[in-house]
């Protein structure tokens, strides 16, 4: 499978007016968020579902992602918390004994916009040198409407994460142990409870 087959053009527009052209992946809806970078080599699924990345558009510096596919156990939260994803290249033929699907299928299912075939390290240097800024992933060509898009990006304010008002109680099965643990649930990663139970 060629990752460029049937791929639609997409653009990453920064609030300073910089525009990068690539190809869309996942949802075709526009996504506005705070542009940040991540230097991890693996763990893309955990990065996208980490509550700490709520409302961010994440730029991956590692040039290839998705080569081991996705599975439900790697999600740190029930839903993807990131707004969007910027990558260099994704693997259309992943291989792993735990794999349940490909990254493109995962993004479509979760309704998350992504863009690929960009120089993510150049974008990372821009963030590092110039600071964090808002950005937009869109499948609409910004030529002729860039000023309106930039105004929209600048006007976007990062919302308060939903977990600030998180009131749901979650109980884990009781284990025979002399210890009890209580966690204040601020939409913590699923793994925290799982790890507590395993020790």
Descriptions of predicted regions:
Residues 188-199:
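Conserved small/polar residues in nucleotide/adenosyl-binding loops
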Residues 1-187:
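RNA-binding accessory domains that recognize and position tRNA/RNA substrates
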């Amino acid at each position: 499978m060629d990752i460029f087959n049937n791929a639609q053009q997409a653009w990453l527009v920064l609030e300073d007016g910089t525009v990068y052209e690539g190809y869309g992946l996942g949802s075709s809806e526009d996504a506005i968020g705070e542009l940040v970078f991540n230097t991890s080599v693996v763990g893309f699924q955990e990065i996208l579902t980490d509550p700490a990345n709520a409302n961010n558009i994440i730029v991956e510096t590692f040039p290839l992602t998705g080569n081991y596919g996705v599975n439900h156990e790697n999600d740190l939260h029930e839903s993807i918390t990131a707004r969007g994803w910027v990558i260099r290249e994704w693997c259309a033929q992943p291989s792993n004994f735990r794999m349940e699907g490909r990254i493109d299928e995962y993004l479509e299912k979760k309704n998350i916009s992504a863009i690929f075939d960009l120089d993510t390290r150049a974008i990372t240097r821009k963030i590092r040198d110039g600071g964090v800024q808002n950005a937009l992933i869109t499948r609409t060509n910004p030529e002729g409407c860039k000023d309106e898009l930039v105004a929209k990006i600048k006007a976007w304010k990062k919302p308060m994460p939903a977990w600030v008002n998180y009131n749901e109680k979650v109980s884990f099965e009781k284990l025979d142990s002399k210890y009890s643990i209580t966690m204040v649930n601020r939409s913590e990663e699923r793994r925290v409870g799982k790890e507590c139970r395993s020790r």
